[in-house]
Amino acid sequence: MARTATRFSCTACGESLPKWEGRCPSCDAWGTVQEEATTLSAARRGHAAPREVVALADVDALEAERIATGLGELDRVLGGGIVPGSLVLLGGEPGVGKSTLLTMALAAIAQRTSALLVTGEESAAQVRLRAERIGGAGDIRVVAETDLDGVVATIAKERPAVCVVDSVQTLWTADLASAPGSVAQVREAAGALLRVAKEHGVAIILVGHVTKDGAVAGPKVLEHLVDAVLLFEGERGGELRILRAAKNRFGATSELGVFAMTGRGLEAVEDPSALLGRDELGAVGSVVACTLEGSRPLLLEVQALVSTSCLLYTSPSP
């Protein structure tokens, strides 16, 4: 017999509370504590079987072969490719090109192994239109689904090498009374996908939108669950896109990937320093400095403009 339990959580930081409060004691945000209703099964409480314990020295230390995405800039940030069984979160503002980036990666992966795209924001026909624009609609398998249980069952049945879920905010489960995109729904979806990824060795990439507060997929509870957090950034109206890792359990977090958005999708920018105008280097008021982002040197140009003034300035009195 199932019973319903009520708890409270902060929509800003994800902190769980035993009762409602006007201000969250963890992040000091006002009016962010909301009620959550969860369903508990009485048949499962207190009936968990003990698990087998092994010595750490007896565990096989075989390093799993990474799955190359076919995009050099993405592989650079990931540390050489996607690790099987890992859970990766790709965050960025809406419209920056997250779906385009992952569709291109899936198209390259599908030529060598199985790849699955779970879409909750678009229909299968809309996904095909985008894939045809970038020239990779052939081998990608796609399913349009937002029910969490259905998504988990599909991944467990298909067992693709790489699966992309676009996006995590659209997933929901009937076990929770809150709306899709809430703290409880996002946390439950990430936990369920983490379990299926580890159990079946499927590399899962979650797409999460950045909120107005700068958090990826809502509160930061997701960032503690996943193995890697990638941030995809770009200026509004500009063509350059920057990919960086905020967290990576299987590689460095200092690497940087640079892309350019074109009519055929994203193109890798292997030498960002070449974007500087060679003819303008050495001009008056301009200086070029070199900085290091991971293993990549980057040239940065700083400009200063100085002109004469018509105003009269008096010298300070001694």
Question: Across the structure, where does each feature detected by a protein language model lie?
Answer:
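Short, small/acidic-rich helices and loops at N termini and domain boundaries
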Residues: 2-45
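Extended interfacial segments that mediate partner engagement and assembly in macromolecular machines
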Residues: 37-117, 121, 125-126, 144-145, ...
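Conserved P-loop NTPase
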Residues: 40, 44-56, 157-158, 169, ...
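Conserved inter-motif catalytic segment of the P-loop NTP-binding fold
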Residues: 85, 93-96, 100-105, 109-195
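Conserved nucleotide-binding/hydrolysis micro-motifs of P-loop NTPases
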Residues: 96, 121-125, 146-149, 169-171, ...
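Conserved P-loop NTPase nucleotide-binding/switch module
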Residues: 162-244
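Conserved small/polar residues in nucleotide/adenosyl-binding loops
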Residues: 313-318
